[in-house]
Amino acid sequence: MARAFNKEVRRSITRSVGRFLAIAIISALGCGFFAGLLMTSIDMNISADEFYDATNTSDLYVTGTLGLDDADIDAIEHVEGVRSVEPVRMADAYAILADEKYVVRFNSLDLDAARNSDTSDGMHAISDDEEYINRPILVEGSWPTGPGECVVAADAVLDEPMQVGDVIEIVGGSGDIADTFARTQFVITGLVRSPYYLMTSNFGSSELGSGDVDSYAFVAPETYAEDFPYTGAFVTATGAADELYPSDGYDSIADALVARREHEFRLPDCTPLGSAG
């Protein structure tokens, strides 16, 4: 019976070779397409994880209702499982760029660490400083040398693109400008891409304007008023860089650190960023 069946199969193929080849090719294409879809997701995750590691992207972001102080930063540094901590200041403001008013988020930047980093390949921010977290990549121009200079988003979609040499002037905010900024005018020295602002179409929400941040800028810590507190702290977790993001191994490390903060320490709110370390 098996011989008869095999003989009939051979006859069916030889009588309609064209149809058989067409079905075989369609099946092969379908299998190849499906395999490609499966591999695309894996390859994208691997590429993203390599980028996160190359820019020392934070695993957690710690915030406080009234901001953070040096005592809070010291407490965070002593939490078991914390690899490194970088306190940061962020503030949204109305700023004039090319005679147009936009909502710009100003971020503090360790200028020495930035200048000592190597971003020449456009994908990595090589630095020996573990506390230099969420390292921007310089696309054009140079890093700021002082409080009167800044680098801005290379991918911001504005009516007129920002260029090296342009001037940004802060003209307003949610309160008195002097309570937040010690300086309100900056010369753009470079354009950057930041792992903290991955979505080029959306840099975050704001209480100002239409509710969206139009662009971001990195400025010297001295830009802010003397009494302006840290608005948060970027944290990297021990062992997170060795895990692929996203993965169960990575999530367990980040979740354990958040749980440890909640149950063992009286610290400000701690939120996973959803990005690898």
Regions found by a protein language model. Name each.
Residues 2-23, 27-277:
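Membrane transport/envelope proteins' first extracytoplasmic loop
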